Design a protein with these regions (language model features):
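Hydrophobic ligand-binding cavity/cleft-lining segments
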Residues: 1-60
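Eukaryotic N-terminal targeting leaders
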Residues: 1-3, 156-159
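Intrinsic-disorder/low-complexity, polar/charged segments enriched in Ser/Thr/Lys/Arg/Asp/Glu/Gln
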Residues: 5-9, 66, 115-117
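Short, surface-exposed coil-to-beta transition loops
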Residues: 7-9, 75-79, 98-105
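Beta-strand elements of well-folded, non-transmembrane domains
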Residues: 14-16, 73-75, 122-126
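Glycine-rich portal/gate segments that line the openings of hydrophobic small-molecule binding cavities
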Residues: 54-94
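Beta-strand/loop substructures that line and gate deep hydrophobic ligand-binding cavities in soluble
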Residues: 93-147
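Intrinsically disordered, low-complexity terminal tails and linkers in eukaryotic proteins, enriched
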Residues: 151-155
Length: 159
């Protein structure tokens, strides 16, 4: 069984200006979830060189939307599963061949007059060991991508 370990977590705050009142906050969260779904279906919008070759969408027994994606990055082809709920989006890559298992999750917190916080959480197979300088570069790339995603969402939310 693959054991995943946390490797990086950070958050980006979206200001509450467009979220006054419970109904408005709920509407913003629904729109934000739709934007994150759009990003999951079209990652090339923010990640140059990463394309979805195919996406199968369905609703699981718990009521979450699930995307089974086939992704292409250069010559590499891999699969993942994206699970979208009201307050969380999880990208899960299974272990296949040379690629170790990993997850990337975005949690939505706050709203209703409070700032909306996007918490980004990364986990990977505990056997993955990277040199410190590579780990640092990867972390910077993740953080930049997440900040770009949050800014893109804020722009489309009118925040």
């Amino acid at each position: 069984m693959t054991v995943l370990r946390p490797v990086f977590e950070h958050e980006v705050t979206l200001p509450a200006t467009a979220m006054e009142g419970e109904a408005a906050a709920a509407a913003v969260r629904v729109r934000l979830a739709a934007l994150l779904m759009q990003f999951a279906k079209h990652p090339h919008m923010l990640i140059e060189g990463l394309h979805c070759r195919s996406v199968k969408e369905y609703t699981n027994d718990a009521g979450a939307t699930v995307l089974e994606r086939e992704l292409v990055a250069g010559h590499a082809v891999f699969h993942d599963t994206v699970t979208v709920t009201e307050d969380r989006v999880v990208f899960a890559v299974p272990e296949t061949g040379d690629m170790k298992a990993s997850t990337f999750a975005i949690s939505l917190e706050g709203g209703d007059g409070k700032d909306l916080v996007l918490r980004f959480h990364y986990e990977e197979d505990e056997t993955v060991k990277l040199p410190a300088h590579i780990e640092g570069l990867r972390t910077k790339a993740w953080k930049a991508k997440d900040q770009d995603l949050a800014a893109w969402c804020a722009k489309h939310l009118g925040i």
